[in-house]
Amino acid sequence: MHLARFPRRFIAHLPTPLERLDRLSAELGGPEIWIKRDDCTGLSTGGNKTRKLEFLMAEAELQGAEIVMTQGATQSNHARQTAAFAAKLGMKCHILLEDRTGSNEANYNHNGNVLLDHLHGATTEKRPGGGDMNAEMEKLADEWRADGKKVYTIPGGGSNPTGALGYVNCAFELLAQANDGGLKIDHIVHATGSAGTQAGLITGLKAMNAQIPLLGIGVRAPKPKQEENVYNLACATAEKLGCPGVVAREDVVANTDYVGQGYGIPTESGMEAIKMFAELESILLDPVYSAKGAAGFIDLIRKGHFKKGERVVFLHTGGAAALFGYDGAFDFSSRWVG
């Protein structure tokens, strides 16, 4: 599969590490756990969206854009990485931040990813939750274009066929690492939200005939909607790659049992996952996305979903910067001993 024919801005630190998690594996007593460290992509604390932005921002440059506009939730990792990428390329960035939680916490609204958005020079504006954010963004972009501004819009999560190419590439990268290290991967698990990561991964895996089951742990939409979104995007991505029909509907699997009360609202199991990964492996998760993916992964291990001795890769999508917007979700009073 010749990805080099697509414009790309090489910014990410790739390949990201593929590591075995011995202490977490021993603690859970199930499969042999490995982690693909896409929290280490290098741009402004890293994260999965940088892979997508390599292709999206290259397209923006080719179109002569002066401003990139995107949207996401208040503590959006995607927004932060877009702001950082734009700064790196000397472009302006404007972000529409959707209030999906109703939180009035100062750190949630001004710290974490929001602080980094502004540090990278982005301008932001808030929008109420529940609207069609991509449509609102396009409406605003059209108004700016009418004033003569050259605006390139990026959908939430960078999730369109161009952005999904970043995770087609990740699938190729992961398979190459496994082949070089003699690692037979039995399953891949990751958090899934805006659909681009899962769509790109499954397209890349199927294009390479890898035959590795891929499971997305949902963080927002119900299962039927999540799987529909991923499948439709995977089909469009495969079409763009020149391998239409390579992804079947049954290849797209999401488990949405770990969303909790809603997107961006921490769960008890997610907080447990954050503490387990931090205390056992010194790896940081975030309450919005990676922690819910890890919580589902941990629960499925405990329920025997994966066989003992199987090798399962958890793809870490990053997001640790959001921890500083959720300090109120933690209670470490017992850790103070003096």
From Swiss-Prot:
<protein>
    <recommendedName>
        <fullName>L-cysteate sulfo-lyase</fullName>
        <ecNumber>4.4.1.25</ecNumber>
    </recommendedName>
</protein>
<keyword id="KW-0663">Pyridoxal phosphate</keyword>
<comment type="function">
    <text>Catalyzes the desulfonation and deamination of L-cysteate, yielding pyruvate, sulphite and ammonium. Involved in sulfolactate degradation.</text>
</comment>
<feature type="modified residue" description="N6-(pyridoxal phosphate)lysine">
    <location>
        <position position="49"/>
    </location>
</feature>
<dbReference type="Pfam" id="PF00291">
    <property type="entry name" value="PALP"/>
</dbReference>
<dbReference type="InterPro" id="IPR005966">
    <property type="entry name" value="D-Cys_desShydrase"/>
</dbReference>
<keyword id="KW-0456">Lyase</keyword>
<dbReference type="GO" id="GO:0019148">
    <property type="term" value="F:D-cysteine desulfhydrase activity"/>
</dbReference>
<dbReference type="InterPro" id="IPR001926">
    <property type="entry name" value="TrpB-like_PALP"/>
</dbReference>
<comment type="similarity">
    <text>Belongs to the ACC deaminase/D-cysteine desulfhydrase family.</text>
</comment>
<dbReference type="InterPro" id="IPR027278">
    <property type="entry name" value="ACCD_DCysDesulf"/>
</dbReference>
<dbReference type="InterPro" id="IPR036052">
    <property type="entry name" value="TrpB-like_PALP_sf"/>
</dbReference>
<dbReference type="GO" id="GO:0034011">
    <property type="term" value="F:L-cysteate sulfo-lyase activity"/>
</dbReference>
